[in-house]
């Protein structure tokens, strides 16, 4: 059957029929949204003078700023007390989280008139006794500090308001109607008990559920979100309720919706204006950091094209600048960017606040300079009030370490909500208790599983189960049928869609027990839209066949040995980098990479090796080691890097320095010539096109017996022997071919020694040629752990090198002739261009 029951409409009829138009009555509903809905029904349909219709919370929420202590001040007072308790050492951030729990506990003790000293007699466990002593200390100090403020706690103030309302109802002989389903709490229970002779209860009727119930299990939460968006887009002319009490999921759903009314509220910390203030505070509380600076500048409220241009300028090596003054030393393309940097430095880095109050005051000033209209933005009024209050209460946190304050600020800000609502929105997002009494054309129950729709008792962190029972403080006093009652009311709407993603946060979802109780025949498994056989196609089809190749009419004339390796392993990456000229920039937030450390080691070893004969040859082992370390420190000092990276790399350099000196001394014993960072080239003519392959050999050794070894220093992964034999790692092979072709022209000895057919090695003393049919290639792995230096050597014969040369020629012929570069061949471990080939 089609559902025709509406609780509020039924209640409106009850008001007219049973009470009459002129009856004086006070109607109390569970929440404000239900009150607004009921008023609308009464005015639109019955045209009557409205009785008093209020939510229960309004009885205890009249506010005058001076009447009670604010939540923020109370949390700060409690956290200060917790921090001063030496037997349970907690930092300021941890103490704030503990303060939130203690605040509720202490207020419950006060409201229920329970003596804190009673709790220590309920459990003789040594652990719990320590906890109870801590609680007693905090409670007594909390009462003392609250008395100094000459204000009441909010809970005591609420109790006072409630008592005043109870007296007013009794003396005025008012009739009170409690309509709907109320979440029980200490205030509501007291209200019911004291006014039992004045209260009329109007509860929802149990009706037959709708036959328009559909159930679907998307694969994950993002597919579930798309389903919600799809349903809403197909039902724009209908009134829709999305029921959830999960704020995190709500934010995901809202990303796919246009107009909606949000009854859950937004965490002010997660809004653009909240993140703007948090970013400024992080900058003021820490040493200069480009990542923190751009976290601020890329906020949507102040981001602009100049920020994007500046980010490009500061990518790669400039991303490690350690002071704002370096911003003005950049080579600017135009004066506008320079002026932007100058203004930025004046606003952010001119003043240095020394305590929390000064930080908060300066934060407000900086915010208004960066965005003069900030307080007019959504949530601006709430944020300004929060900032003003926190500044006033900063005496409780002035002793906090500056670096800890951003976390404290963020935690406190997370306690503040603001509500963003769209006029005339047909989509309402709210909790079950907000929406259960109202009528909708379509109800969507997303993420309908035990996590969200089954109440489970949780252990209290500060009280044992026995203590809770004896003290009669029930933290899980919500009636077990509460969510079942909400669910039954939702099922009496016209159409209900139940969704439950199969996975969430990497875990499988378990359907709610409430859903399992439904009769099988009452639920349609998929068809939510009449006449639609497929609910939603969630499979994204590829835009093209991945085997398609890219065509290029030209081929480069100069290649490096590393580009040859890219051509072999990742043709599309070669095309993007070498032909299109695309280069990956290291973003500002990227940490120094292992390749950056490798570049440092190459510079250090080059500097040491090239000056060895002039400066270090006669030094002892320790002095040589110190010389190597000093070279590294000098290079690090002149390199822009984060200070923590410099310290880490200094430690690594010191760790392997002795092992490298011993390695170097041992290698030199059998060498008569050594060349370092030597440039070479290999010239080829491929199908009429001249190709030059260039490379730099880290180290080339000529032994006393005229054997040649080419060495390559590696701080990263070295290729396997199989990869070298197959030509997948051709760097040292191509450098060996350069030797055969006399490609190292600046090294006279190599030119004399090398000739391609076969490799002739001449004795410099006798000038008589000695046939040598091999070249040795060696990878020297350098690490900061033992073994610090490890050498892998492979001997390549002339015949093997000639086969590799033929393979190289064939490879180049293929690409020069065919002019196609495949998408789907990718053997690289690291691929900066993978996203471009999709």
Swiss-Prot record:
SUPFAM superfamilies named in the record: P-loop containing nucleoside triphosphate hydrolases, Restriction endonuclease-like
Pfam families to which the protein is assigned, alphabetical: PDDEXK_1
InterPro entries in the record: P-loop_NTPase (IPR027417), PDDEXK-like_dom_sf (IPR011604), PDDEXK_AddAB-type (IPR038726), Restrct_endonuc-II-like (IPR011335), RPE4 (IPR022439)
Listed name of the protein: Uncharacterized protein RC0550
Organism: Rickettsia conorii (strain ATCC VR-613 / Malish 7)
């Amino acid at each position: 059957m089609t559902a025709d029951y509406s609780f509020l409409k039924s209640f409106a009829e009850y008001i007219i029929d049973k009470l009459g138009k002129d009856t004086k009555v006070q109607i109390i509903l569970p929440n404000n949204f239900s009150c607004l809905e009921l008023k609308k029904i009464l005015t639109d349909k019955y045209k009557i003078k409205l009785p008093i219709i209020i939510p229960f919370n309004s009885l205890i929420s009249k506010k005058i700023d001076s009447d009670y202590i604010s939540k923020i001040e109370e949390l700060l007072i409690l956290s200060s007390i917790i921090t001063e308790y030496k037997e349970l050492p907690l930092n300021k951030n941890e103490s704030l989280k503990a303060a939130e729990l203690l605040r509720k506990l202490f207020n419950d003790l006060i409201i229920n008139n329970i003596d804190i000293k009673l709790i220590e007699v309920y459990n003789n466990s040594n652990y719990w006794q320590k906890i109870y002593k801590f609680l007693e200390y905090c409670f007594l100090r909390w009462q003392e500090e609250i008395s100094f403020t000459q204000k009441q706690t909010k809970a005591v103030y609420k109790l006072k308001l409630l008592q005043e309302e109870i007296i007013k109802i009794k003396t005025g002989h008012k009739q009170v109607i409690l309509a709907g389903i109320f979440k029980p709490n200490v205030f509501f229970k007291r209200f019911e008990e004291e006014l039992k002779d004045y209260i009329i209860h109007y509860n929802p009727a149990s009706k037959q559920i709708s036959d328009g119930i559909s159930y679907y299990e998307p694969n994950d939460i993002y597919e579930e979100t798309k389903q919600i968006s799809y349903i809403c887009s197909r039902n724009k002319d209908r009134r829709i309720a999305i029921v959830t009490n999960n704020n995190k999921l709500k934010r995901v759903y809202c990303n796919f919706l246009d107009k909606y009314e949000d009854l859950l509220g937004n965490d002010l910390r997660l809004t653009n204006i909240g993140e703007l203030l948090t970013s400024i505070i992080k900058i003021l509380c820490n040493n200069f950091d480009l990542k923190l600076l751009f976290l601020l500048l890329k906020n949507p409220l102040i981001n602009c094209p100049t920020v994007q241009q500046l980010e490009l300028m500061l990518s790669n090596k400039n991303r490690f600048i350690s002071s704002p003054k370096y911003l003005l030393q950049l080579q600017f393309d135009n004066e506008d960017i320079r002026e932007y940097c100058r203004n930025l430095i004046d606003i952010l880095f001119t003043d240095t606040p020394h305590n929390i109050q000064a930080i908060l005051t300066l934060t407000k000033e900086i915010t208004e300079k960066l965005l003069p209209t900030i307080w007019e933005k959504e949530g601006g009024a709430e944020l300004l009030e929060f900032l003003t209050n926190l500044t006033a209460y900063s005496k409780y946190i002035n002793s906090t370490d500056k670096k800890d304050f951003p976390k404290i600020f963020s935690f406190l800000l997370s306690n503040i909500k603001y509500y963003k609502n769209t006029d005339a929105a047909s989509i309402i997002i709210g909790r079950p208790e907000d929406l259960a009494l109202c009528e909708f054309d379509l109800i969507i129950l997303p993420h309908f599983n035990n996590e969200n729709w089954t109440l489970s008792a949780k252990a209290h962190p500060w009280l044992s189960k026995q203590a809770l029972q004896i003290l009669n403080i029930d933290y899980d006093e919500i009636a077990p049928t509460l969510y079942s009652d909400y669910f039954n009311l939702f099922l009496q709407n016209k159409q209900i869609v139940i969704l439950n993603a199969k996975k969430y946060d990497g875990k499988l979802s378990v359907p709610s027990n409430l859903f399992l109780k439904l009769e099988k025949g009452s639920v349609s498994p998929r068809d939510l839209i009449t006449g639609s056989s497929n609910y939603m196609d969630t499979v994204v089809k590829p835009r093209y066949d991945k085997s398609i190749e890219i065509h290029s009419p030209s081929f480069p004339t100069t290649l490096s040995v590393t580009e040859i390796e890219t051509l072999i392993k990742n043709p599309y990456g070669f095309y993007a980098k070498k032909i299109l000229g695309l280069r990956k920039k290291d973003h500002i937030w990227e940490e120094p990479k292992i390749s950056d450390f490798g570049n440092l080691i190459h510079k250090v070893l080059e500097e040491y090796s090239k000056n060895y004969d002039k400066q270090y040859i006669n030094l002892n082992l320790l002095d040589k080691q110190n010389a190597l370390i000093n070279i590294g420190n000098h290079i690090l000092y002149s390199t822009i890097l984060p200070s923590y990276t410099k310290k880490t790399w200094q430690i690594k350099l010191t760790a392997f320095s002795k092992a490298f000196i011993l390695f170097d001394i041992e290698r030199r014993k059998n060498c008569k010539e050594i060349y370092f960072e030597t440039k070479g080239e290999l010239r080829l003519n491929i199908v009429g096109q001249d190709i030059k392959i260039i490379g730099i050999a880290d180290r080339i050794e000529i032994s006393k017996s005229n054997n040649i070894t080419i060495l390559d220093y590696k701080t990263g992964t070295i290729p396997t022997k199989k990869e070298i034999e197959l030509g997948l790692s051709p760097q040292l092979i191509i450098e060996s071919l350069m030797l055969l072709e006399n490609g190292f022209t600046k090294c006279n000895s190599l030119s004399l020694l090398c000739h391609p057919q076969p490799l002739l090695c001449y004795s410099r003393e006798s000038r008589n040629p000695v046939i040598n049919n091999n070249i040795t290639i060696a990878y020297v792995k350098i690490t900061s752990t033992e073994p610090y230096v490890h050498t892998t050597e492979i001997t390549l014969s002339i015949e093997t090198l000639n086969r590799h040369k033929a393979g190289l020629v064939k490879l180049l012929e293929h690409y020069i002739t065919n002019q196609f570069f495949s998408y789907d061949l990718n053997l690289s471990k690291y691929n900066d261009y993978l996203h471009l080939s999709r």
